[in-house]
Amino acid sequence: MFRPLTTIFLATLCLHLPAAQGESVPEEKTDVIPIAKIPDISPAKPGQFDRAFRRGVDFLLKTQNKDGSWGDHRVIGTWNILCPYPDGPLTFKTASTALCIAGLNASPLHHEPAVQEAMTRAEDYLIRTMPHLKRGDALCVYNTWAHTYVLDAMSMRAARLAPDSLRYRELKECARSQVKKLNELASAMGGWGYLT
């Protein structure tokens, strides 16, 4: 009689032992990424954004090149960038110009005559330059960025114009040629990667 009771006791103990161990307090996970805390920053003061837009637009108007573009091939600082001449610098210049057009066009100051004139000069530069833009070499494919940024800038600008205007047609044709170039530059899978 003692033996069956001992067996039942040990069997019951074995069954309850894992359940008791499972009730322990779980350990804190160490692989969890903490949620960033929102900084305690006061809201913008009236006019704060207006001043920032003014400074940015004034900077772009002041630094626009005589040919209507922005940027150049000189390295500022100590960065070395793979940039075969002459196509690499031209690609950077056209991409920078398109980004500046997009920024000016999106700013609340886009209606000012000086801003309109600067964007028109930049568009003229891109319309003249983009047909000659090509890949620098097999490794340097920055022209994909330039075609993309120019397509975006021309589309944004054309959206503010009357569809029957000459300028609208010029921008539309420039945008159409960027789409054609991007289709030619697409990878075998049909997209554009970092090195397409």
List the model feature ranges, each with a label:
Residues 18-196:
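Preference for long, amphipathic alpha-helical scaffolds in soluble/luminal domains
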Residues 6-16:
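Bacterial N-terminal signal peptides
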Residues 1-4:
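Positively charged n-region of N-terminal signal peptides that target proteins for export
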